[in-house]
Design a protein with these regions (language model features):
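N-terminal secretory signal peptides that target proteins for export/translocation
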Residues: 1-15
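Bacterial N-terminal signal peptides
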Residues: 14-32
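Boundary at the C-terminal end of the N-terminal hydrophobic targeting segment
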Residues: 30-40
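Conserved functional acidic sites
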Residues: 39-306
Length: 306
């Protein structure tokens, strides 16, 4: 489960700890105070989502209330994760740039992500998202560079339409509890098999920035990580505010909380754009078979929105 989809670990719930909600999930009950937990859906799960490029008429206007991607928005999440058997400090900085990139005929918004472990850059990433006319936010792939001791060691890129990779839904337009899980993308060449499922709604959680009511929790799983779930907490109009986990198979046990939420000034946005373009230049050199098959990103003011 990719780090960019960060949420934040549970610390405060409205009327009950998370384990109570988990125990009640199979019954489909609504707890006091309006807290709703998932129930088993009879609808079949799709291996892949039904992608139709004609449904992305205003693809770069990503205004899904749970997953808004407004140009210049920056989230900073802090917490910890497990690395080589010990807990280490973790900081994630996610920025919506003013770049777009056309992938398989759909213009996507480019996110620039920096992942720090113990104060050192562990990964830098470009991620690509678009919204369809039903409000679903789709992931069209990513280009991550992973580092060790300051040197890039690998870049497991995947892009929709290349190497049997397929775009997936990161956030439904209207999340509902009684729906099956959905593919968040399929990329067998880099073992990307993530799926999401609406787990709980109407929750309350508190992070260093503030407390949030009516929080949506999405549980994410992967074929590569059985018996492991990453829990992403979303607040309306903000996006991801917390990341937690559950399951005996969860190895990283990543915990993150939103500590900063801001809108960049023009100068800072220009610096983010330059950094993203520098990473893209590297991508064309490193990932010639995947990223090299894509068209260059464009500055949004000069790009035609689709």
């Amino acid at each position: 489960m990719m780090t960019v989809k960060c949420g934040l670990r549970h610390r405060a719930f409205g009327i009950a700890p998370i384990f109570v909600s988990i125990l009640l999930a199979s019954s489909g009950l609504v707890l006091p105070g309006g807290v709703a937990v998932a129930q088993k859906s009879d609808a079949p799960e799709k291996e892949f989502e039904d992608f139709d490029r004609t449904k992305f008429e205003r693809s770069t206007t990503i205004d899904n209330e749970w997953f808004p991607l407004k140009v210049g928005t920056r989230w900073v999440h802090r917490g910890s994760t497990t690395e080589r058997g010990k807990r280490v400090a973790h900081r994630l900085v996610t920025t919506v740039t003013d770049l777009t990139k056309v992938i398989d005929g759909v213009r996507t918004v480019v996110l620039w992500v920096e992942d720090y472990k113990e104060g050192k850059l562990d990964e830098a990433e470009l991620a690509f998202f678009a919204q369809d006319k039903d409000g679903n936010v789709w992931s069209f792939g990513e280009y991550p560079e992973e580092y060790f001791n300051g040197r890039m060691i690998r870049a497991p890129a995947w892009i929709h339409g290349l190497n049997d990779s397929t775009a997936g839904i990161m956030m439904p337009g209207v999340p509902r509890l009684d729906t099956p899980s959905y593919s968040q993308g399929w990329a067998p060449s880099v073992f990307w098999t993530d799926r999401g499922k609406v787990d709980q709604m109407g929750q309350k959680t508190c992070v260093p920035l503030r407390c949030y009511d009516d929080v949506l929790i999405v549980a994410e799983t992967s074929k590569a990580e059985p018996n492991a779930e990453q829990l992403k907490y979303y607040a309306r109009g903000i996006g991801k505010v917390r990341v937690g986990w559950r399951g005996e198979g969860e190895k990283l046990q990543e915990v993150l909380e939103l500590t900063e939420f801001s809108q960049l000034a023009p100068e800072a946005l220009a610096r983010a754009r330059a950094a993203a373009l520098k990473l893209e230049k590297s991508a064309y050199n490193v990932s010639k078979d995947v990223y090299g098959a894509t068209t260059p990103s464009e500055h949004m003011p000069s790009a035609q929105h689709r």
